[in-house]
Amino acid sequence: MSTERIAILPGSYDPITKGHVALIARAAKLFDRVVVAVMQNREKQYLFSSEQRVRLAEISVSEIPNCTVLADDGMLIDLYKRLGACCVVKGIRNDTDYRYESVQAEWNRAHLSSFETVYLPADDAFVAVSSTEVRNRLNEGRDIRDLLMPEAAELVLSEEFWKA
């Protein structure tokens, strides 16, 4: 088994926000390698395709040297085993997040006893930042630049991005 401490930060990232990036940057200081896992749930509707979500994530975390991005449509516990991860990191903005993530963590641990979940509280500056807010603003024609990393925001706002 590798001595490298690998943390997975799974999410739909539809799209990845400044709040996500802040959490990823914090995790990158705690672990040898962080893997941003853009997950695909067949029962969920996404605004952005898997390829678009990966591209936005790669652009957004490009300044974090020990961070990689991948897409996965399988079970998180399978990815955890495949990567030899030491934990999954989840950001917590409020009690609702904690309750939801606790249920997920219990299920994962029940199915893989070595599965660990680490909770990091969201930075106060990003508590109100969410992918849902980005999607709502896009639907309403409102500005999203304060919610996304600059290059990601410009890409989302470009016509070429939507033709891909």
Predicted segment positions?
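Nucleotidyltransferase catalytic core that binds NTPs
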Residues: 1-164
